Amino acid sequence: MSIAVTTTDPTNTGVSTTSSSSLTGSNAADLQSSFLTLLVAQLKNQDPTNPMENNELTSQLAQISTVSGIEKLNTTLGSISGQIDNSQSLQASNLIGHGVMIPGTTVLAGTGSEEGAVTTTTPFGVELQQAADKVTATITDKNGAVVRTIDIGELTAGVHSFTWDGTLTDGSTAPNGSYNVAISASNGGTQLVAQPLQFALVQGVIRGNSGNTLDLGTYGTTTLDEVRQII
């Protein structure tokens, strides 16, 4: 029995943006114009024996600059947000036709129609938050019966993917169909959290108001932040 292994160090490249309502465009310009008109009127009608202090004038002029600065800041943030959206769309579109590992437990097995064809299976994997000295994969059929137990051994923290050779416990070849995999991991006898991963093929990208989603065909859709590994 052979298992192909792929390991990826855990990284976090997620980017989140927050938008809020603000004064932009003509509203900000109108407010600035009104503010200047009121300030000029105040200066014209002030008591000449008690004129406005320099620090008061400076403070009010600073408020005008603040309004203008907020408008420019909103424009800049809008531009940055648009660039981030475009970058994420490009990143997502580059995944079309590629396999990805996402949270899940499904493993598919299939054998070609020709005589002597080798059974092929979709990869499965695990995500560990810390190193484990004992990792076991248990494969069950659609009825929940255990058909194979694989001793993976030690694994470092991170994302790891494997390929089952399609052999059952008795040495026979697994029938075509869908199987489930459960991962057990421990370190020094202490059970660890082990997130099982399944393989899916990215068939398209769906753009929406809430961001981009990946079309995984029969596996439905998922978001970029759910992708643990690209194969």
From Swiss-Prot:
Positions with biased composition (Low complexity): 11-26
One GO term describing the cellular component: cytosol
Keywords, ordered alphabetically: Bacterial flagellum biogenesis
InterPro entries for this protein: FlgD, FlgD/Vpr_Ig-like, FLgD_Tudor
Entry keyword Transcription regulation: no
Keyword field contains Amino-acid biosynthesis: no
Annotated Pfam families: FlgD, FlgD_ig, FLgD_tudor
Cysteines joined through disulfide linkages: none
Name of the protein described by the UniProt record: Basal-body rod modification protein FlgD
Species in which this protein is naturally found: Escherichia coli (strain K12)
